Amino acid sequence: MAKQAIKRAKILAVKNNNKIGVLLINLGTPDEPSVPAVRRYLRQFLSDPKVIDVPSLVRWIIVHLCILPFRPKRSAKLYQKIWMPEGSPLLVYSEMLRERVGETLGDDFCVALGMRYGKPSIETALKKLQEAQCRQLIVLPLFPQYSTSTTASALEEVRAKNSFKEMTVIDRFFEEPHYIDSMTTLIHENLNEFQPDYFLFSYHGLPERHLVKSGCQLAICNRKNNCSPISSSNENCYRAQCFETSRLIAKKLNLTDQQYGVAFQSRLGRAKWIEPYTDKYLIELSKKGIKKLMVVCPSFPVDCLETLEEIGIRAQSQWQRLDGETLKLIPSLNAHPQWVNAIAKMAKKSLQLF
């Protein structure tokens, strides 16, 4: 059925000389690792009411009086540590992914990249697809696990700028077999040179209140335990989706429950975020005698500040101070051939929704 839908869509596209547009969305990055550029980026990012979900006046005070006077200088130094000759890793790898997905999908498709914050903007990406005479639009935010602060915010921006009459959205893929297989292959490739004592799956954290607002009916569950398997009562719970992704990858790797764990990084501010925290989890692992640790970041399909600096540098340094022998960070999927094919397959699969 799906193959017939894809075939019909391709015939229609060719007949009308119209392409199918694919919009890949990532979070965004500063234009350069300078204080002014980081300040511009953070101002746009943190002013989003879906990111800091408090009354507008309170948000303005937090952003303009508590964060922007101080954080840009610190963050710029962190970006400088990971900046590539070609530019921001997030942008470089995202563009590489866009290009290779386009090559894989072929001439009947046009693939564009839009950043929720910074450049290239979602509006710019949509204009490119319109100029390419695309008449159908597939939107794929590169956030495997759904959350209001990433996926919902990106989709809200798309709908505000979109002029396509036919649009389908892939709003999550945390349990998509092609994604899980891509992650598993990536890990297997790194196991050839390193055999860890333990696997840690580290995800971007969120304030706990975001889970409540997302409609998770298990938001008052015991956060010290693993989330329950995905069901109608927690299908929009970001934390539950992270645990489900980890379970699926661990199953593919034949890991026992004692061989891996899940933690959350990148917390900001004083509000309570979902636990356990990655930095504190490292302390617990060291107390258990773990020496060789492999860290995987499934919520980041593209390498960025949170993977390369927060884990690759800061967590690495922390692990050494804790007398750990080795902390190996698995690279993000970036433009891995299997991941490129996975995105192409997800895009084609979504055509049956038109």
From Swiss-Prot:
Annotated GO CC locations: cytoplasm
Subcellular location: Cytoplasm
Reactions this protein catalyses: heme b + 2 H(+) = protoporphyrin IX + Fe(2+)
Principal subcellular localisation of the protein: cytoplasm
Gene Ontology annotations of biological process type: heme biosynthetic process
Keywords linked to the UniProt accession: Cytoplasm, Heme biosynthesis, Iron, Lyase, Metal-binding, Porphyrin biosynthesis
Keyword rRNA-binding: no
Keyword Lyase in record: yes
Gene Ontology molecular function terms on file: ferrochelatase activity; metal ion binding
A Pfam cross-reference name: Ferrochelatase
Family in the record: Belongs to the ferrochelatase family.
PANTHER family referenced in this protein's UniProt entry, alphabetically: FERROCHELATASE, FERROCHELATASE, MITOCHONDRIAL
Its biological purpose: Catalyzes the ferrous insertion into protoporphyrin IX.
Protein name from the UniProt record: Ferrochelatase
Origin organism lineage: Bacteria, Pseudomonadati, Pseudomonadota, Gammaproteobacteria, Legionellales
